[in-house]
């Protein structure tokens, strides 16, 4: 395979949605794992990971924010293999914190690969894990005569991996008719520990499922989709059955369009069945599901859906909306669209390894963290691994599903959960912050009550209350932006100067906020950023945009205030603006290429 370093890139259509909609509970992280027939050696696994990342440099990315969109940027971070230490599919992307978007862990005989959906989809994750497992097994067993093999095309390049296939196959001419979506039945019964993700796995025979599917004249996915809808229906009340059971079924678009991309490239269909108005027999449900798949799974319909999604993203007005506004709209849209589906069924298909490596592997498995009840499956050899994930009480639905399988002559074997005792994320920092916020609120409230009742001649109560509010705002910015010191400094500059303007206005406007505070804070912040970047030896791409923002703020705002004659004593303000101007000139002269690249990244639409 041709090796070349990855470059910064725009997010694909699906990644733009995931970057906006992910949160602490809905992490949009999924786990693909391989269970071996022997205990994992962490040192060898680390060496195998180092080799794998050379093949897939597109994974060495961090998520950054631009003015209009997020983007992915190469970084110097390297993945470190760890023993499994937290709940499966926990958050990988933490706002403002520079972290990789994937993680490799191990536990006993299991190698786990977890990845944020912004980085890749199920197909990309499968290829990465296969390469990792292959490298690991070769390093362990080469002394026994195991030969190295290639799993990827020799002529595949990094450019192939980075192709945005959504854009490649987008066509303005493709349109699909609008369909009115009915609200689907929702699973709402929360577990007592509903904040935790519950994973229940079982294994069945691939051949048994295929045999029964062929007898019925349908594909494995159609067969299992019908059973899944029936299992959900059995737990619905008469009132609940007025709404249809609708499953979201992801579709790998590489089966319709030629693509070697490691980025997201999938679509979905939504088979739904109303058990009140339609025949409830298994034969009728299976017939409906088969016809639905045959109708929807066509290249033309997939292409039309791609065009529909891209048309919204590429709308000339919507593209120019600020990122934060886009995020709010995407989050609202994602929340609304949840009403249209009951659960998710994702078939990752068969994982294939070279014959010489098969004897060392027990099975592969996959599951994901979503706000919905989800069934994921993948197969290896004759083992079909099912994984139900949910934060709701779905035990009865799972029981129904396996009972229905048994009625079709397919036995299942439960997989005993093997997870270490996880380190719960520390809530101590947030607890301290909440106590601090409570004390600040208490002091401000006490000062206002004192002011109202005693009317002190020197209004020290209001000054105290204002000082506490100012201190709380500054420390809150420091707390929530603690992962990025340079962004923290920029926010402190922006909010700090606004607070000073307010204080100046409330005390009779003596112009000290614009004459002194604004230029001094701007130059001080710019200097602090420069020193911090040098001391921490940050790459240019990590600090340049913040220095440009600080210098621009220290030049443009004082300039406007000078022109509007708001500044009474212009000397300090003019010298501050001069320093910021010279800094920007120096950036253009000495860091012109980096400056241009940062502007492209942060202003791309």
Give residue ranges: language-model regions.
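Acyl-thioester-dependent acyl-group transfer interface
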Residues: 1-67, 77-102, 234-415
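Generic detector of multi-pass transmembrane helix bundles and their immediately adjacent loops
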Residues: 510-605
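Membrane-interface helix-boundary motifs at transmembrane edges
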Residues: 425-427, 476-488, 535-545
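Non-catalytic, low-complexity flexible loops and terminal extensions
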Residues: 2-13, 102, 110, 119-127, ...
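Hydrophobic alpha-helical transmembrane segments and adjacent interfacial helices
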Residues: 439-453, 470-478, 493-510, 526-533, ...
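Membrane-helix interface and helix-disruption motif detector
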Residues: 444-466, 481-486, 502-521, 539-542, ...
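N-terminal topogenic module of multi-pass integral membrane proteins
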Residues: 416-468
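Central hydrophobic cores of alpha-helical transmembrane segments
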Residues: 226, 489-496, 544-554
């Amino acid at each position: 395979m041709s090796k070349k370093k990855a470059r910064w890139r725009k997010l694909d259509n699906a990644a733009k949605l995931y970057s906006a909609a992910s949160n602490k509970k809905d992490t949009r992280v999924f786990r693909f794992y391989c269970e071996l027939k022997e205990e994992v050696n962490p040192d060898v696994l680390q060496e195998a990971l180092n080799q794998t990342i050379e093949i897939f440099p597109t994974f060495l990315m961090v998520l950054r924010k631009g003015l209009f969109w997020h983007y992915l940027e190469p970084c110097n971070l390297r993945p470190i293999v760890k023993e499994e230490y937290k709940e499966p599919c926990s958050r990988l992307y933490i706002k403002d914190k520079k972290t990789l978007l994937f993680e490799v862990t191990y536990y006993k005989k299991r190698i786990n690969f977890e990845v944020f959906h912004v980085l890749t989809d199920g197909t990309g994750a499968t290829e990465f894990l296969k390469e990792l497992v292959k490298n690991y097994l070769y390093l362990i067993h080469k002394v026994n005569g195991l030969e190295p093999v290639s799993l990827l095309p020799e002529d595949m390049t990094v450019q192939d991996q980075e192709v945005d296939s959504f854009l490649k196959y987008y066509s303005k001419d493709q349109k699909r008719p609008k369909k009115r979506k009915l609200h689907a039945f929702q699973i709402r019964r929360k577990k007592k520990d509903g904040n935790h993700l519950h994973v229940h796995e079982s294994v069945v025979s691939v051949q048994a499922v295929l045999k029964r599917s062929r007898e019925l004249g349908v594909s494995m996915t159609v067969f299992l989709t019908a059973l899944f809808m029936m299992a959900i229906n059995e737990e619905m009340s008469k009132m609940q059955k007025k709404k249809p059971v609708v499953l979201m079924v992801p579709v790998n678009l590489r089966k319709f369009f030629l693509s070697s991309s490691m980025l997201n490239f999938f679509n979905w269909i939504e088979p739904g069945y109303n058990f009140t108005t339609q025949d409830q027999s298994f034969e009728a449900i299976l017939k409906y599901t088969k016809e639905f798949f045959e109708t929807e799974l066509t290249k033309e319909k997939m292409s039309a859906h791609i065009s529909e999604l891209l048309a919204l993203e590429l709308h000339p007005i919507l593209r120019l909306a600020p990122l934060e506004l886009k995020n709010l709209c995407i989050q609202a849209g994602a929340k609304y669209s949840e009403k249209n589906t009951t659960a998710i069924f994702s078939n990752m298909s068969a994982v294939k390894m070279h014959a010489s490596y098969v004897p060392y592997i027990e099975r592969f498995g996959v599951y994901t963290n979503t706000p919905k009840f989800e069934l994921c499956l993948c197969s290896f050899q004759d083992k079909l691994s099912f994984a139900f994930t949910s934060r709701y009480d779905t035990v009865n639905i799972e029981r129904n599903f396996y009972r229905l399988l048994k009625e079709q002559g397919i036995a299942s074997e439960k997989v005993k959960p093997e997870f270490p005792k996880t380190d719960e994320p520390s809530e101590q920092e947030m607890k301290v912050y909440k106590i601090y916020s409570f004390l600040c609120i208490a002091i401000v409230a006490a000062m206002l009550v004192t002011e109202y009742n005693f009317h002190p001649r020197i209004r020290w109560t209001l000054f105290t209350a204002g000082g506490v509010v100012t201190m709380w705002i500054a420390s809150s910015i420091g707390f929530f932006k603690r992962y990025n010191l340079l962004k923290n400094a920029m926010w402190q500059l922006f909010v700090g100067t606004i607070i000073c303007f307010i204080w100046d206005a409330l005390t009779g406007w003596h112009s000290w906020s614009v004459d002194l505070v604004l230029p001094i804070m701007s130059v001080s912040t710019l200097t602090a950023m420069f020193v911090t970047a040098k001391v921490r030896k940050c790459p240019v791409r990590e600090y340049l945009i913040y220095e440009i923002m600080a210098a621009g703020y220290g030049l443009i705002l004082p300039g406007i205030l000078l022109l509007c004659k708001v500044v009474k004593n212009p000397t300090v303000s003019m010298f501050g603006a001069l320093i910021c101007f010279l800094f920007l000139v120096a950036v253009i002269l000495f860091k012109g290429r980096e400056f241009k690249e940062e502007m492209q990244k942060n202003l791309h639409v």
